[in-house]
């Protein structure tokens, strides 16, 4: 099971360019990772320009021959392909109405990441979003073990 999320960057005209992020979308991991490794407008833009992804910062790769995960250099695992490009939303409301079963959304605003929990309610046929509940949540400070 994955904690899905959406990562966006606020553009000068208040539109948001965003991508899907599949794994570990909760603030304690994705929020901390975004703040640690993608903490400038340039880094956030480059991350989003790559399109939809499995993970923004992966240090493991599955080896099909051995059936085990191997440690690798940290990298973003993009899906690739024409259907995986970023989506441009004209405003925050439109951004919250993108349906990718996300539990959290993140927006890079000026010089920092802002995180929100999100819940979308659908009509009885699950064809249309009828209500969106968005609440800003704190991105915790990175925990270190000593």
Where are these regions (language model features)?
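Low-complexity intrinsically disordered segments
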Residues: 36-146
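All-alpha amphipathic helical-bundle segments outside canonical DNA-binding/catalytic cores
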Residues: 31-35
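Short, extreme N-terminal segment that most often corresponds to the first beta-strand
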Residues: 1-26, 30
């Amino acid at each position: 099971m994955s904690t899905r999320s959406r990562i966006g960057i606020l553009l000068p005209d208040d539109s948001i360019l965003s991508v899907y992020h599949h794994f570990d979308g909760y603030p304690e991991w994705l929020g901390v990772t975004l703040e640690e490794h993608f903490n400038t407008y340039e880094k956030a833009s480059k991350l989003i320009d790559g399109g939809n992804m499995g993970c923004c910062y992966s240090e493991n790769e599955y080896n099909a021959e051995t059936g085990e995960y191997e440690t690798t250099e940290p990298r973003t695992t993009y899906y690739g392909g024409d259907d995986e490009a970023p989506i441009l939303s004209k405003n925050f409301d439109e951004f919250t109405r993108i349906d990718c079963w996300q539990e959290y959304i993140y927006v890079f605003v000026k010089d920092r990441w802002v995180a929100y929990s999100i819940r979308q309610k659908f009509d009885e046929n699950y064809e249309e979003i009828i209500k969106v509940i968005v609440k800003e949540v704190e991105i915790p400070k990175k925990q270190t073990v000593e």
